Swiss-Prot record:
Note on how the cofactor is bound: Binds 2 iron ions per subunit.
Catalytic activity: a 5-methoxy-2-methyl-3-(all-trans-polyprenyl)benzene-1,4-diol + AH2 + O2 = a 3-demethylubiquinol + A + H2O
Species of origin: Burkholderia lata (strain ATCC 17760 / DSM 23089 / LMG 22485 / NCIMB 9086 / R18194 / 383)
Name of the featured protein: 3-demethoxyubiquinol 3-hydroxylase
GO terms, molecular function: 3-demethoxyubiquinol 3-hydroxylase activity; metal ion binding
List of residues binding Fe cation 2: E87, E139, E171, H174
Reported cofactor(s): Fe cation
Biological function: Catalyzes the hydroxylation of 2-nonaprenyl-3-methyl-6-methoxy-1,4-benzoquinol during ubiquinone biosynthesis.
Amino acid sequence: MVFDELISEFDRGLRSLTGISRMSRPVPAPAEAPAAELTPAERTHAAGLMRVNHVGEVCAQALYQAQKLTARTASAKAMFEEAAREEEDHLAWTAHRLKELDSRPSLLNPLWYAGSLAIGVAAGALGDKVSLGFMAETERQVESHLEGHMSELPAADTASRAIVDQMRIDEVKHGKAAADAGGIELPLPARMLMRAASKVMTSTAYYL
């Protein structure tokens, strides 16, 4: 059973890194067509933001894969699996939008993935309550990050905005579920370290 799990997660990891993630839900569609075409500068900025969001989903896949494999209880495993499945939708949606913007994923995705996998293993090793608390805090920070992107994305980029808004809704749900399942609040130094690491990732991925 453990071997089967490892094979399954290895396959999911390969899909995350090669851009062939499966989506269980269609790409969110904007409520209305854009009033104007994006300017070249707006396309470049939108692509940078969506590349950052794509990297975040690569990291989420690695985190939740590791946390699922190290979870002690069946309920925690199921929660990480459900979150990973929805995050795989996000991964596919952001990859799709990057192609539409004539852009590409981050060149450093293997590095982001490996680092997040190690962090997920470390969180899981501390027990389910800590691991779920890490998930809840991660989702809170991602929610804040996505809200920032909603204010930064060009008003005319209704396609990207529809994707980011649905991602935000999903992240709120994941964070609440993890907290309700018994995830503990992480100490302030841990939360600050997470924000600092996220800042490095987002500022780098925007360009690379």
